[in-house]
Amino acid sequence: MQHRLDLVDVNYVYMPRKSSAFQEYLDSMSLRNSALKASYENQLVVRTGYSFTYNSAGNAMMRTPTKNSYSIRANIEEAGNLLYAASKLVHPNPKDGEDYVLANIPFAQYVKADFDFAKNFMIDPRNSFVFHIGVGVAYPYGNSKMLPFEKRYFSGGANSVRGWSVRSLGPGVYKGSEDGRMDFINQAGDIKLDLNIEYRTHLFWKLNGAAFVDAGNIWTIRDDSGQEGGLFKFNEFYKQIAVAYGLGIRLDLDYLILRFDGGMKAINPVETGKKRYPVIRPRFSRDFAFHFAVVS
C-alpha cells in the first residue's frame, strides 16, 4: 500500500513567441476552436494532489502475476483555488471576460479524479484472465473554461482501446478533422472510460501470448463547436463506447515487459449503419492498429 501527497506542484507553460499572423489566426479560431487557442496560451498550473496505490500481491507488481490478485489506484488533484482566493482579495472585480492573473500570467483552476481497478484470475500456472476498469473525470471552473492540454484525457493507443492509434478516438462521436487526419488538439476530453479483459498464456521461454477485448471512449463536459458530438450525455454515452479486439505478445524480462499488440476495430461509434460494426466485415487497412509499449 502506498500513499503519496503532493502539497505543491508548479508547472508553467510559456509560449516564447507567436507571430502577429499566427495570433490573428488563433483569435479568429477562438469561437470555432477554443481548444486550439487555449493550447497556445501562457498558463500557470499550481496543483495539490493525493494518490493511493494498493496491490494485494504485495511488492510483486501485476506484470506477470502467479496468483489471484487485484490492484487499486486512485488519484485526486485540484489546482488554482488558493491563487483564485488571493486574486479575489487583491483584485475583486476584473473586467468582463478577463481572467485572474498572477504576475500577469493566467492560472488554471480545476479538479480532477481518477480510479483504476485491475483483477487477475489464475486458471492454472500458465493461463490467466485479467479484468481492468479505469474511470477519470476532470472539471475546469472559476478561472478556467478548459483544462490545461496536458491534463486532458485521450483515448486509443497501447493503454486504452487498442483498435485505434494513440489519441485518435473520441471525444464521443467526434469525427476528427475534415480531411480525415488525426486531430490531437480536439481529440481530447474531460471524462474517460476504459474497460478491458485479457486472456494471457505462457508460450515458451520468456514469451507470453494475449488475446484481448477493449472498450471505452472520452467525452467533454462542456459543449464545444470544435468538438461536435463530444459532449457527455447520460442517455447517449453508452451508445458511443468503442470496442476493439486483438492479439499480443509479451516479452517478460523480469525487470520490465515489452508489449506488442495488434488491435482491430469491432464497434466504431463514429460510423452509422453497417459501417458501425467493422467486426462483421473487417478490413485490415482500415481497422488495424499496432502498438508497442514498455511496462516497468
Name what the model sees in each region.
Residues 251-256, 282-296:
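Outer-membrane beta-barrel "beta-signal"
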Residues 196-198, 242-250:
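Short glycine-rich, acidic/polar surface loops and turns
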Residues 1-201, 211-234:
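C-terminal outer-membrane beta-barrel translocator/porin domains of Gram-negative envelope proteins
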Residues 67-69, 124-128, 204-206, 253-257, ...:
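Strand-connecting loop/turn motifs
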Residues 98-99, 149-150, 229-234, 241-243, ...:
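Short beta-alpha connecting loops at secondary-structure transitions
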Residues 215-232, 255, 263-281, 296:
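C-terminal beta-signal and adjacent terminal beta-strands/loops
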